[in-house]
Amino acid sequence: MSDLLDDEFYEEEFENDLLDASEFEDEFDEDAEIDDDGFTVERKRRRAHSVSYRVVSVRDLRASLNEKINQLTSIIDLTREQVLGLYRYFKWNRERLLERYIDAPEESLQKAGVGLSGSKQREVVHHEGTCEICYDEGCLPFFSAECDHEFCLACYRQYLDSRISEGESVIQCPEESCTQIVSIQSITKVLDEKSLDRYHRLLDRSFVDDNDHLRWCPAPDCEFAIECHVTQASLSSVVPTVTCNCGKQFCFGCGHDNHQPTICPLVKIWLQKCQDDSETANWIHANTKECPKCSTTIEKNGGCNHMTCKKCKYEFCWVCLGPWTEHGNNWYTCNRYEEKSSTSARDSQSKSRASLERYLHYYNRFANHEQSAKLDHELYEHTHKRMTQMQVDSNLSWVEVQFLKNAVDILFQCRQTLKWTYAFAYYLARNNQTEIFEDNQRDLELAVENLSELCERPCQDCSLSVFKQRVLDKTVYVRSRRDVLLDDTARGLAEGRWEYVVDV
């Protein structure tokens, strides 16, 4: 990236290093074409719950960036620095850039901080003067960007280093009132090699961060990005799950781990609810009741059944929830369970408790599959040892015992899917579509438990070949049940069949 704006760098041809990471999907190659961002995109027939995406390397990102700048400089008479500044200001939206620039070229350049021509080469010069930052005087090395605001070289370098350390890739002139962006050529003249390398990595990141169709893989130390053209507006009808070359699977829309079949808006609501409710929900359910008048949660801290709500001062009976005025002097016993006022209060509380019990039903199953998925991760180590032992006990090669690891892989995927089916089901309105969804959910859950049990128990009751065939058959079946559930849910999202109890 150090030669980002050199002509030779722009003209250099890169091999197509785009790698397909959709190894978990059944797909068929068709003709390839070039998209608007310069990436090679292969059109494929995919499952209903899959989306088109590409994994791109830093090398490809830089090639695409250079190509975009080259294309625009051939249309409008600007330097590469100015085109780069415009692109970054308009978030790499070519159409919006051209529209605004054609309508108001000078204003667009000024807002982008590249209004001044960058054709003049900036050099460090020595002369008598005073630095306006440190106020050193004498014959000093001075430097200025395209705006000609001059400061001593040491201060300029320190200023750039501090901005880069703060993660900034668009750096304005040190002059307080100046909006001019310091060009890449100018920064190259001032910084040492180590600082320049950090700056160029920031440029790479900004290209992805500012582009709606690109997202960095969230895996630690992974340098791949994902290119996907699913828009934010469509996230209520599609779950754009992608898989990086490093193996990380995540949602392109929100960046969370794969949460199919639940759409991103529901994921956000569910996670917030879990954070707010789950830690205390069980305790509340067991130890508290709600005021029949204002519904404030109340904990009983003594033996007396005469309760007074601290919030609204309403007096009621802890046992039957009726007004205390109807209880006379029977402070520690209650025989008025069938009174109309008590029944009404209990009905109100019953609805509230039913809502809490419904939430706990879905949350407990959500949490159970999350815990099971973590245990399946531990199963990998056990599986590796078991695969090694299989080779010792038979004449199978390492490739031939991969069926066991593949089974654990699909188990983990299905646990993740099942976990999120409960979040999705919690927000579904009850109708025929919900019944079908729960049938598919039940079938997948049963298939997963059968495969999990088979993988964990020793194969003492049958030969290795029979055991292998059983695992292969159940793995295929589990994968097919997952596809059925996800495909049906995805089609329902696309067709608008799902109805929710919350607004999304």
UniProtKB/Swiss-Prot annotation:
SMART domains (UniProt xref): IBR
PROSITE patterns linked to this entry: TRIAD, ZF_RING_1, ZF_RING_2
Binding site for Zn(2+) 2: C147, H149, C173, C178
Positions annotated to bind Zn(2+) 1: C131, C134, C152, C155
Subcellular location(s) of the protein: Cytoplasm; Nucleus
List of residues binding Zn(2+) 5: C291, C294, C309, C312
Descriptive protein name: E3 ubiquitin-protein ligase dbl4
Organism annotation: Schizosaccharomyces pombe (strain 972 / ATCC 24843)
